[in-house]
Amino acid sequence: RTRNMRSLPGSHGLGHVRYPTAGSAMNPEEAQPFYVNAPYGITLAHNGNLTNSRSLQREMYALDRRHINTDSDSEVLLNVFAHALQDLGAASKLESMRAHHARVQLSVDEIFAAVSILGERARGAYAVAMQIANVGLLAFRDPFGIRPMCLGFQETDQGTEWMIASESVAIEGLG
């Protein structure tokens, strides 16, 4: 509801209005966006399909020790990305910063490296929007750019507002 959204603090948000891309469309547990709290607090929404979702889910459990709770390929994508950040050594940096009550500082190189790792592991066509807690928004497509992704903005009294969507009609609706 609009009145509920207006009371939320912060200047970033991530939403999804499309049915789940894999699994059961009737299962509310598969509604996007998906969230993991480790290593940083990452939220993901995506449009697309993974062709290796099942095998990647098994691989994530056996090798990466990550349990996927649903049949959604979105949750698989999220965990592949989160694990890549963790493997890049970012998790140890996070623990050090938490101990000193400092904000997490991820480098652009670390984030892009995690996206590259995801692109190497995940097969299929996808457009992804993510929010990393205390860092910001991230958007990317599969390595072949099969799924569309649009970037829009509008100037307001509070500054520039940015929007990422898998179809331009979502942005055009803002005026």
Per-range role (PLM):
Residues R1-G175:
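Conserved short alpha-helical segments that host acidic/polar catalytic motifs at enzyme active sites
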